[in-house]
């Protein structure tokens, strides 16, 4: 019988966190120390009798994804008080949680998966849980409300296929914050081992294509920045801020943005997360 257990499971067993998802988020946030040493990989096997400490502020949201939307709100000046929103690619519900904590009155939590949304959110009357729903085919029959805001955090599918659907359910002048993930936007031949895209030139190409996809889908791109939290396996990701309506030409220093993101994240200033 093994005398070691995954760190995320141990956190739950010892009552240091309520769910495995939250335990994983806490670990990847760098808040967990085992025998005095920081461990930031949730799957690390540690001795069953190890001393485990949680240091610093615990996570405000049900998953670390909420921190990504929090940064978008701060950077883009987003206000969600009284808004009807959608969380596209909700998963555990970090974005949904962030929306509710910032005043959203209703959130449609959309995900192609099943059984992932945190129970706290699943049982919240302000949340409409839309599991087993492919966001690519969203329409007004599924979301009858006119949405003020939508977030997009999807994997294994390009934003090129998601943005037109989001445009269909968003009101004119509504806003979108979306994660731009090079590993799912670049061609397969440009994705490295373990699904990581490291080449800055590929990142630049992805961002240029994103501007085109947004315009073709009926959006104006208001701003772009990089996410201070890397994706799984350490991928650098970007955040786009869009408005539904006629295209307004704006100029972005995409080359400078890519250089800034690599300078900030390639040197380990932020850990990988989900």
Predicted regions and their residues:
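Glycine-rich SAM-binding Motif I of class I
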Residues: 93-94, 115
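Conserved S-adenosyl-L-methionine
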Residues: 98-106
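Flexible, glycine-/basic-rich loop-and-beta segments that form/coincide
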Residues: 236, 241-274
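S-adenosyl-L-methionine
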Residues: 105-161
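A short glycine-rich, Lys/Arg-flanked "PGG" loop and its adjoining helix->strand segment in the class I
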Residues: 160-177
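A basic, amphipathic helix-loop patch mediating RNA/tRNA/ribosome contacts
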Residues: 1-50, 84-85
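Short, glycine-/aromatic-enriched active-site segment of Class I SAM-dependent methyltransferases
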Residues: 182-199
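Conserved class I S-adenosyl-L-methionine
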Residues: 81-91
């Amino acid at each position: 019988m093994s005398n070691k257990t995954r760190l995320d499971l141990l956190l739950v067993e010892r009552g240091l966190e309520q769910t495995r998802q939250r335990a994983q988020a806490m670990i990847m946030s760098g808040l967990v120390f085992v025998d005095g040493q920081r461990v930031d990989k949730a799957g690390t096997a540690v001795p069953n009798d190890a001393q485990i400490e949680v240091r610093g502020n615990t996570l405000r949201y049900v998953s670390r994804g909420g921190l990504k939307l929090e940064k978008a709100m701060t950077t883009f000046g987003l206000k969600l008080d009284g808004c009807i929103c959608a969380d596209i690619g909700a998963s555990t519900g970090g974005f949904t949680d962030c929306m509710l904590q910032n005043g959203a009155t209703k959130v449609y939590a959309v995900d192609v998966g099943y059984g992932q949304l945190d129970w706290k959110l699943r049982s919240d009357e302000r949340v409409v849980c839309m599991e087993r729903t492919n966001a690519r085919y969203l329409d007004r029959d599924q979301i009858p409300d006119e949405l003020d805001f939508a977030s997009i955090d999807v994997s294994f599918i390009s934003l090129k296929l998601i943005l037109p659907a989001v445009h269909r359910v968003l009101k004119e002048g509504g806003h979108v914050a979306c994660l731009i993930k090079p590993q799912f936007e670049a061609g397969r031949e440009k994705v490295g081992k373990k699904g990581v895209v490291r080449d800055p030139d590929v990142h630049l190409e992805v961002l240029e294509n994103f501007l085109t996809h947004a315009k073709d889908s009926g959006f104006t791109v208001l701003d772009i920045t990089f996410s201070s939290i890397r994706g799984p396996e350490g991928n650098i990701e970007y955040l786009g801020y869009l408005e539904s309506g006629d295209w307004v030409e704006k100029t972005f220093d995409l080359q400078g943005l890519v250089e800034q993101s690599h300078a900030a994240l390639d040197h380990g200033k932020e850990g990988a997360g989900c």
